[in-house]
């Protein structure tokens, strides 16, 4: 015997609450997953920001060492000049100071030189040093305009050897004397030997113009491609279109990555 229509309606009404209970459970589970995912993403973002801050602090320490080498060199050089040291005495002192500067900065390959009495004295003399028009060099002009402050140039191609270099320099505006360090790619390699990255993490160090100075990546790619990739990231950061709050990019291997960055006091 078939149940009456009223019985069917009562059974149907009993099934409705069960459906809504099931729906509520599903929604609760989805909201829980969404909330968990948001928490994980936020934790990942905070960790990325902390790492960027930590790496920037390490860069600042290296920058401080370079500044100290230049500042101390300038102070001692001016003291020697005030004591009327001869050119030979100045050159002997500078040779010793350059050796100590190399030890302090962790690499014998750092090119150190000075300008005294219109002459360049170098730790590793290059061809044409006696006729090199340093007064017209952008690094000298930039340092001269800084009125004795230490400057860091952007990366450029050295006229002496055709290699990429960053020059750290200070010039005494009265005498025109200068103390100079040239940082080549291997110097940045040495200073980052202890870099500890998270698994699959990538690290890029750029100058103020976005030129790549050092990198460590978990994938294989041509250096020129990496350089262009990083320049584009820097362009977006400077334009304000790439921020840490929502930055998500595809790297050269096709992997999705978050982007975290800090700018150091010298513009790196």
What are these regions (language model features)?
Residues 114-115, 158, 206:
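Hydrophobic alpha-helical segments, especially N-terminal targeting/anchoring helices
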Residues 113-126, 165-169, 210-217, 260-261:
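Amphipathic coiled-coil signal-relay and dimerization helices
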Residues 3-42, 46:
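Extreme N-terminal signal-anchor transmembrane helix of membrane signaling/transducer proteins, especially
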Residues 90-105, 178-221:
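Solvent-exposed, extracytoplasmic
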Residues 46-149:
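Extracytoplasmic/periplasmic sensory segments of membrane signal-transduction proteins
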Residues 177, 219-220, 224-268:
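Extracellular/periplasmic juxtamembrane segments that couple receptor/chemosensory ectodomains to their
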